């Protein structure tokens, strides 16, 4: 939900941003597009990073940096007007760059934690968060823009992201590493299609460095 709320910040605060920074419709068009360009460019590299370094580590960096670049958008008015628009474009570009691994990471986490027969429901839950975020955060961020100013839309969402980063580091684990995972539960999800050791490579194994056909089969099965 926070992922999509962060994306929507500029849509909500954009009118006030354009007015204060004296940005034309064309300039705002480029700024709005920056996120999508970066998101597109980073999608496949983001998936490669997830496969190489694991879901938790990559998602941690992704969450931290998208929160950082969201937070920093609240301070672009400190630059001279000639640079403020360029700074906002850069922040939005880096936001898209940072968020790109998130949905591939969600898919990997679902594959690692849920049996095949439960995977569709689990995926639907995290995908529905985008609509939940619009219903929950849009009116709140709109009020924030009106009551406190557009800068606080970005700073508040950035701080929320920093808090979530800390919680993510503390609470999220791989199935095989989770301190509260019982042997029975691990056996159950593993035997029913969960790829529990997805992020644990076996050094020196040819299978570890090549295509994981067994995992691909499990991911595609339903």
Where do the model's predicted regions map?
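Juxtamembrane intracellular "pre-TM" segments in multi-pass secondary transporters
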Residues: 175-222
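Helix-loop-helix hairpin linking two adjacent transmembrane segments in secondary transporters
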Residues: 126-179
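C-terminal ends and interior cores of transmembrane alpha-helices
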Residues: 64-81
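Membrane-interface helix termini in secondary transporters
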Residues: 16, 47-48, 143
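Cytoplasmic helix-loop-helix junction between adjacent transmembrane helices
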Residues: 91-131
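Residue-level signature of mid-helix packing/kink "hotspots" within the transmembrane helices
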Residues: 8, 36-44, 100, 134-135
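Extracytoplasmic
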Residues: 1-25
């Amino acid at each position: 939900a926070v992922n999509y709320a962060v994306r929507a910040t500029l849509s909500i605060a954009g009118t006030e941003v354009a007015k204060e920074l004296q940005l034309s419709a064309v300039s705002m068009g480029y700024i709005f597009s920056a996120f999508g360009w970066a998101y597109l460019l980073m999608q496949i590299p983001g998936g490669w990073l997830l496969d190489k370094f694991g879901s938790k580590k990559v998602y941690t960096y992704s969450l931290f940096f998208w929160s950082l670049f969201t937070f920093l958008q609240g301070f672009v008015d400190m630059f001279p007007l000639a640079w403020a628009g360029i700074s906002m474009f850069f922040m939005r570009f880096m936001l898209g760059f940072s968020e790109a691994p998130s949905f591939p990471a969600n898919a990997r986490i679902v594959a690692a934690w849920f049996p095949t027969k439960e995977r569709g429901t689990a995926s639907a839950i995290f995908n529905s968060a985008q609509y939940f975020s619009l219903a929950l955060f849009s009116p709140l961020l709109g009020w924030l823009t009106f009551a406190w100013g557009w800068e606080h839309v970005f700073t508040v969402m950035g701080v929320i992201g920093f808090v979530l980063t800390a919680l993510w580091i503390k609470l999220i684990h791989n199935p095989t590493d989770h301190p509260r995972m019982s042997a029975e539960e691990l056996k159950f999800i593993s035997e029913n299609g969960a790829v529990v050791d997805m992020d644990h490579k076996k050094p020196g194994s040819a299978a570890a460095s090549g295509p994981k056909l067994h995992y691909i089969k499990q991911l595609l099965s339903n």
